[in-house]
Amino acid sequence: MDDEIQAVVIDNGSGMCKAGFAGDDAPRAVFPSIVGRPRHHGVMVGLSNKDSYVGDEAQAKRGVLTLKYPIEHGTVTNWDDMEKIWHHTYYNELRVAPEEHPVLLTEAPLNPKTNREKMTQIMFETFNVPAFHVSIQAVLSLYASGRTTGIVLDSGDGVTHTVPIYEGFSLPHAIQRLDLAGRDLTERLVLHLTERGYTFTTSAEKEVVRDIKERLCYVALDFDQELITAAQSSALEKNYELPDGQIITIGNERFRAPEVFFQPSFAGMESGGIADLVYTSIQRCDLDIRRELYGNIVMSGGTTMFPGISDRMQRELSNMAPANMKVKIVAPPERKYSVWIGGSILASLSTFQNMWCSKQEYDESGPGIVHRKCL
């Protein structure tokens, strides 16, 4: 492959799509993974009257559109809409011709094989890419942190995973998955704010709550103690100005919403929290590598951005781990984009260039080639 041609790296998350060029240190385009369609035909007269809108444009016109996320819990559920998002990525965001650049896509751990094949097929047949590769998101996050062995806690908008990785390969038997992530925490906050007498119902209003969550929520080191503190003083209260100018006050909701992450039973789920998830994953790995895993617990994804989350993880895991085990939580400041950054690093390595699955190989073997070339 010619050195002059940069590969395109696309990280398709449940909430946001991150896209750019291999070798760059940050994605060029970050936009919501949404496709919007007019609720009522005829309402959009005078606008460019398209039958669908993608990303920021859909977000801006959300009042008159029905918004859909084609990726749910990390897995593509609507391929037509997914194709629209990829089309938008190439032609409107990056403004490059797909047939001129190899592309590296990302996928959730334990993704169904058929999903991977469909991705491969669309890239080669619809977009005519010259070469293609798909990588597991958590593995890329680990590369971005400069490691090849460790356990990644990856939590975005749609799904949370713990993925142990040894010498660059994920250990599928030990991967744990929790269908609780950013979108669910936003819903929890909606619930708590409703109890305070503020209602948020439309998809547009929920975006406001997401903003409140990202700006004001945090993880308490000791949840019960924090509740007592919040009840005794107003020091934890913060004000937030809504788009219409109304000011709302938010108190213990600031840490009650993210607490679900550590205690899913609050949301009626039987699963253990994220600290239990990490512990279970490590216990399923070989004794010989557990020490290395405990010493390299890497956070990744937007939902790990809450202040206080690292200290709480450190505390909970130190209580669970064997007494002589050193627990180290790594929370890189750029972890919102670490999957993309890892992809950018990987696709620009000279040693990676023979890992691409070429158009010729695809034409000879069909979509199944992806399982042989992309481990």
From Swiss-Prot:
Gene Ontology terms for molecular function: ATP binding; hydrolase activity
Alphabetical keyword list: ATP-binding, Cytoplasm, Cytoskeleton, Hydrolase, Nucleotide-binding
GO CC term (a single one): cytoskeleton
Main location: cytoplasm
Gene3D superfamilies, A to Z: 3.30.420.40, Actin, Chain A, domain 4
Enzyme kind, highest EC tier: hydrolase
Recorded catalytic activity of this chain's protein: ATP + H2O = ADP + phosphate + H(+)
Cellular compartments annotated: Cytoplasm, Cytoskeleton
EC number: 3.6.4.-
Pfam families for this protein: Actin
Similarity field: Belongs to the actin family.
Reported function: Actins are highly conserved proteins that are involved in various types of cell motility and are ubiquitously expressed in all eukaryotic cells.
UniProt protein name: Actin-2
Organism: Schizophyllum commune (Split gill fungus)
Gene (name only): ACT2
